[in-house]
Regions:
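Conserved alpha-helical scaffold segments that buttress catalytic/binding sites
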Residues: 2-268
Length: 268
């Protein structure tokens, strides 16, 4: 599989209706773009990719949809990017958006490996009676057979039910206490990256709804992204909540993570 000509395309998904604690993540796509365009930094990634070069990636803007139609609209939006011969890079929004995105990606790319960076497994069968909560996307993905392999990195809060779900679905969990996890970040087939901003320690990223101390530094996160080996066919960046940010710190970090994901997709 040669993806060198398959351009990464950003798609903003301003949706946070499945958040269980605080809303605000719907405001993130705009804030991330503003931080990415800020003159305080240049467009070069650490892997030597100039994101300012013409045509190296595209931005498809934000999806527009009614809240009740969100999941169908998100799936269709990701599917449209794929049908145009491009790779979706979606900016949430809460983590529930990953399920409809992966539905679209899995139709094109079978045998998908998902590398999931997060403080939480998001494997609840249901949360507060809601099977589509941002606490449940990976249960939906795995029960639907959309991924061959799910690797969760940076987990540091997991209860008995979710450990049972890990066993049920054969999930590979790398808890924060056992990092680094470079050897697990290799796949022979297509790879999808989902990066929840709360994988980072809140000292580095305070602008998140579910702050969980003891997380990754920005440097650790970038090192793990750069350690990924294989063909990346899509990605998302979720759960940045600008309402809780401090002086734009988390927006800047989110833009940095986005830059390095794009750079990794382009450079291979």
């Amino acid at each position: 599989m040669n993806l060198s000509a398959v351009i990464p395309t950003i798609l903003g998904i301003p949706f946070d209706a499945q958040s269980s604690y605080l809303r605000g993540a719907a405001e993130a796509p705009t804030k991330i773009r503003q931080a990415l365009a800020c003159d305080a930094s240049n467009h070069w990634t650490e892997t030597g990719v100039d994101l300012g070069a013409a045509g190296i990636y595209e931005d498809g803007g934000d999806l527009e949809f009614l809240e009740r139609d969100a999941f169908a609209a998100i799936e269709n939006g990701a599917d449209e990017i794929i049908r145009l011969g491009k790779r979706p890079v979606c900016l949430g929004g809460d983590h529930s958006i990953t399920y409809p995105i992966v539905k679209a990606v899995a139709r094109k790319y079978s045998g998908l490996t998902i590398f999931h960076f997060d403080a939480h497994p998001d494997l609840y069968d249901e949360f507060e009676g809601n099977r589509l909560s941002h606490a449940c996307p990976f249960a939906r993905i795995m029960e639907a057979g959309l991924a061959k392999r799910l690797v969760q990195v940076g987990i540091r809060t997991i209860n008995r039910h979710q450990r049972e779900q890990v066993q049920k679905f054969g999930v590979e969990v790398v808890e924060m206490s056992t990092l680094p996890a470079y050897d697990t970040l290799k796949a022979a087939g297509p790879i999808y990256i989902t990066f929840d901003m709360d994988v980072l320690d809140p000292a580095f990223a305070p602008g998140i709804s579910h702050r969980e101390p003891g997380g990754m530094s920005v440097r650790e996160a970038i090192a793990h992204l750069q350690a990924i080996e294989g063909e990346i066919v899509g990605a998302d960046l979720v759960e940045f909540n600008p309402v809780r940010d401090v002086d734009g710190m988390t927006a800047t970090v989110a833009a940095k993570i986005l830059k390095e994901i794009l750079g990794k997709m382009i450079a291979g």
